[in-house]
Amino acid sequence: MANRAKSIIPAEVFPPGEFLRDELNARGWSQADFARIIVRPLQAVNEIINARKRMTVETAKAIGLALGTGPELWLNLEITYRLSTTPAPDPAIKKHVAERSAA
């Protein structure tokens, strides 16, 4: 049997608003409907859906309550997306940290 190297395929990372858009569509809710349900401005909901606004803890709590998911799901999606879109630390900083943490 041939020895095959297993390759790891990274999970797709997407903004939480993309998932929220799918949820609203599945429930037949407009963005305006949802904004009224979670008592947030329509503009804020639209900006989250279009990845122009970060999700706050308060908004994640409201969304989780409205959709029956809990805030953790939304905050995990948010932080995973933000980490994937943030540049890696400067190599000089990485070197400095490695030197300091080895001491």
What label would you give each PLM region?
Residues 70-97:
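Short amphipathic recognition helices of helix-turn-helix/homeodomain-type DNA-binding modules
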Residues 26, 37, 66:
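Residues within the alpha-helical elements of helix-turn-helix
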Residues 39, 50, 79:
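Residue-level detection of the helix-turn-helix DNA-binding "recognition helix"
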Residues 28, 51-52:
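Alpha-helical hinge/cap motifs
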Residues 29-47:
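Short alpha-helical DNA-recognition segment
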Residues 52-67, 82:
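Short, basic-rich loop-to-helix N-cap that marks the start of a DNA-contacting helix
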Residues 100-102:
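Short, intrinsically disordered, charge-balanced linker/junction segments flanking boundaries
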Residues 2-29:
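A short, Lys/Arg-rich alpha-helix, primarily the initiator
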